[in-house]
Amino acid sequence: MDNLFSIAERFGTPCFVFDEVQLEARMRAVREIVPKAVGLCYSIKANPFLISAMRGLVGTLEVCSPGELEICRQMGVPADMVLFSGVNKTKADVERAMDLGVTHFTCESPLHIRLIDELAAAFDPGHHG
């Protein structure tokens, strides 16, 4: 408890404190329960401050906005580790993600499927859905 008081004195309150050792232990416990063929994904909207800690614990980081994508870019997250999700993806959002090398997207509608397929074909002329 003294440690928390010293953290509050140093950083002020409110202050969020994360135990990365405990986080890693819990993620390893999840990994032991889930079949190896199942990939683990962390949605950074839950807490973008945990990106660095989660990078080594999951195979994929999910982003749902251009802002979250930019945070990952700035933190050096490899594009092949990013899943771009979200129902409000625009053409510009998908193009930017593809420019950065993102290749994994969720499709929430037939419109999204067409949009991503068309843009993927433009980025890779050999691709055709």
Put a short name on every predicted segment:
Residues M1-G129:
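A charged N-terminal "starter" segment
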